[in-house]
Amino acid sequence: MRVKSLLCVFFLLLMAGGVFAQVQTGSAYPKREFRAAWIQSVNGQFRGMPTEKLKQNLIGQLNSLQKAGINAIIFQVRPEADALYASRLEPWSRFLTGVQGKAPEPYWDPMQFMIDECHKRGMEFHAWINPYRTKTTLKSELA
């Protein structure tokens, strides 16, 4: 008799647990995934490239990444104590112009350009900075 009572209590507890279980709905999941690509600037692929050619290169990369399902771009804007954006505090990056501290000619702001182009495509823009690196090679001069 005792075994039957324990089984009944166990069965009732099991049933009660099912009544209070919560159903997972689709709204509990994020609206979308964060599918990001990182566009770095330290390998010199932009150095000395004419402005229009560089812009077209970046647009081409964004178009390809968008077609691949990427919805966020992480763009390296501060590679080595310099900037790929207009700044009162940091010199222009040598990875953009070839010489640290030299503004691009014709003048443009690569970070603002990327923000605008990402948003045109419905992509998020995230600025990547290297807060500690000052140089990638001993041969380069700082501004």
PLM ranges: what are they?
Residues 1-7:
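Bacterial N-terminal signal peptides that target proteins for export
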Residues 8-18:
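Bacterial N-terminal signal peptides
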Residues 19-23:
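Boundary at the C-terminal end of the N-terminal hydrophobic targeting segment
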Residues 32-34, 38-40, 44-56, 116, ...:
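Active-site-adjacent "subsite" loops/lids of carbohydrate-active enzymes
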Residues 42-52, 92-108:
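The substrate-binding groove and active-site-proximal loops of carbohydrate-active enzymes
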Residues 56-83:
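Catalytic domains of carbohydrate-active enzymes, especially glycoside hydrolases
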Residues 83-98, 133-143:
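Aromatic- and acidic-residue-enriched segments that line the glycan-binding/catalytic groove
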